[in-house]
């Protein structure tokens, strides 16, 4: 057995989750860790691997302006720009491992930097920056109403809203999320050629101006228990269309988040929990 591990590399990790959106988190600050998409796929398998929605890498910052660098990989091995639930777990990991003692930190990502603020040990506030409603070239979409777009799907025109929270989101308003065909529609929209890099698809049920329910199909993953950036995107759409107030409780399958946005020209904030599950190590 010892000979089996002799030429393999040992990697320590933590298993964490934010509203049951679960992650494998690796500290890469002192030791560079390179995992191929093939290895990430194997590790993400819930039957033969660790099992997770996303892999998070904690890296040292390459700038004096930020404290750490945050990298995210989906279960299929593709690197993505953003993960809101992951950001809270990333912050908690830094606290638990003694990597920071600050109450507020700034982290760089593949796109815009994020500010993470520790309200309590397990309740974390993230500045997700201002939502971007103009990130797509919408020439291929029919402009129906202000910020409403029509996508042809299975011979029908589906009305949706597009917004970026550092990653792309398609928001569909429904009367009830209970029977929404999340995986069927989500998979079809994700593969639509107008989204060459894919898109996260969310189904939003507005209960009142301060409370929504949400189900999410994450690109390259499928339906998940929760998605922080999707919650931000859905609330941003609702506020932009004057359907929601500036503070909204978002009820996802895995739990609840609070999203705060004062409107255009201001950053959007996400408040929610993060949980450490266990520590472990693997040989690859």
From Swiss-Prot:
Site (Important for dimerization): 278
Keyword Ion transport: no
Binding site for substrate: 21, 54, 74, 84-85, 167, 200, 218-219, 228-229
Gene that this polypeptide is encoded by: dapF
EC numbers for this chain: 5.1.1.7
Keyword vocabulary terms for this entry: Amino-acid biosynthesis, Cytoplasm, Isomerase, Lysine biosynthesis
Pfam families for the chain: DAP_epimerase
Coiled coil: none
Site (Could be important to modulate the pK values of the two catalytic cysteine residues): 169, 218
Subcellular compartments: Cytoplasm
Family: Belongs to the diaminopimelate epimerase family.
Catalytic reaction annotation: (2S,6S)-2,6-diaminopimelate = meso-2,6-diaminopimelate
InterPro entries (alphabetical): DAP_epimerase_AS, DAP_epimerase_DapF
GO BP term, pick one: lysine biosynthetic process via diaminopimelate
Annotated catalytic residues: 83 (proton donor), 227 (proton acceptor)
One MF term in the entry's GO annotations: diaminopimelate epimerase activity
NCBIfam families: DapF
GO cellular component terms listed in the entry, alphabetical order: cytosol
Subunit structure: Homodimer.
Function of the molecule: Catalyzes the stereoinversion of LL-2,6-diaminopimelate (L,L-DAP) to meso-diaminopimelate (meso-DAP), a precursor of L-lysine and an essential component of the bacterial peptidoglycan.
Pathway(s) this gene product operates in, as recorded in its UniProt entry: Amino-acid biosynthesis; L-lysine biosynthesis via DAP pathway; DL-2,6-diaminopimelate from LL-2,6-diaminopimelate: step 1/1
Annotated protein name in UniProt: Diaminopimelate epimerase
HAMAP family assigned to the protein according to its UniProt record, in alphabetical order: DAP_epimerase
